[in-house]
Amino acid sequence: MSDSVIAAPALDVLHGRHSSKWRRFPEDVLPMHVAEMDFQLAQGIRERLIKMVSESDLGYTGPVPEVGDAFEGFAKDRWNWKIDKSQLKLVTDVGVGVVEFLRANGLANGKVIINSPVYHGFWEWLGELNIQTVDVPLAPDYELDIDGIEKQFAGGVKFLLLCNPQNPVGKAFSRAQLTELARVAKKHDAVVISDEIHAPLTYEDHEFTPYLNCGPDAEAT
């Protein structure tokens, strides 16, 4: 992540915006959502949106192969991660992707491991399917409790919802620890769902490792 300073709009401008972030709270509250940081859109995105609106190009969205092409290059450049574009599926947001994956795998009314402290949305997403959250908290140094996770896998819980980099503590789990997680998941025929949406925010002196870039066990789980 660059150390360059990027100015945000003035507060009076922000309070005039229409997003939930700026309408939900009174004016004496300064919301600081990581996922909505109020910086100006990149010039290329602004130009494309303006072009689409001016041409009324607003119909239903079908397959968008350009997204796969863009992500393939991005993942290779950032993390040396070679992806299979045929496996990419577009969803409206991370929560929808997680919920529908679990629904498709028959997890309604089942159990899923999470690692607190973690993004509050995890409880909301799993609640949509009446899924029981099995909390295996992070260790005091914010590392994953691999032994605790394996104990739950051995007890019959077959899904883990991972947050990496971890929200809210900002921990980017090491390749060694993710590889060990993949090993125990493979051993117990479990599945890891990795929410990696904040990966591009990793500081330059830290390394983000995609779960699927951690060897055959990760690819199998």
Each model region followed by its residue ranges:
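N-terminal small-domain helix-loop-helix segment of the aminotransferase-like
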Residues: 2-94, 100
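Conserved core of the PLP fold type I
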Residues: 58-183, 200-219
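Residue-level marker for buried hydrophobic side chains located in beta-strands
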Residues: 192-193
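Walker B catalytic acidic pair
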Residues: 196
